[in-house]
Amino acid sequence: MGTFVQWRAEWNAVPTPSYLVYEELLEKNLRILAEVAEDTGAKVLLAQKCFSMYHYYPLIGRYLAGTTASGIYEARLSQEEMGKENHVFKPAYEEDELHRLAAICDHIIFNSFAQWERFGAQTRAAGVSCGIRINPECSTQEHAIYDPCAPGSRLGVKIADFREDLLDGLDGLHFHTLCEQGADALALTLEAVE
């Protein structure tokens, strides 16, 4: 262990900007998430859009079920660096991209029943679990720019457009409306979904 002067010189040599990760705190939080998953039966997934430091994926993979991806590059990163469950959602898919996603993903969420009708059969044939995103039309956000339930949003199927006749083959419903919010907002959203 060097002196403060030596440490400072080393620190000043670090290129900026740089991100520091306290691995002990990261692992402490991961243990909490693993406990939540065990206690509830929920699968806890890493949202790569928020944290894609793949150097830590082996550590994260010891505690979480897998990742969420918003496209082919994040899905590939998940497959290559963590190798656990790989879930993907995008508002729109291109056919060639969906084919590549189906080869590496475990679960694909469609944004509309039109997407499900267009791509569902080929996705299921690849052995991929499929879901559909719903829009609970219940805003819990303070800022419309971050609110997927804001008026005019095209994220997810609204109740007026919901098709019970097209549920066969879907494994679940997906909603994503909570960003840095607590249980109160989740309770309101769940009530709207029910």
PLM regions with names:
Residues 4-6, 11, 29, 86, ...:
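Sparse, context-dependent recognition of short Cys/His-centered cofactor- or disulfide-binding micro-motifs
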Residues 10-14, 34-37, 52-56:
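A short alpha-helix capping/helix-coil boundary motif
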Residues 43-194:
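Active-site-proximal beta-alpha core segment in soluble small-molecule metabolic enzymes
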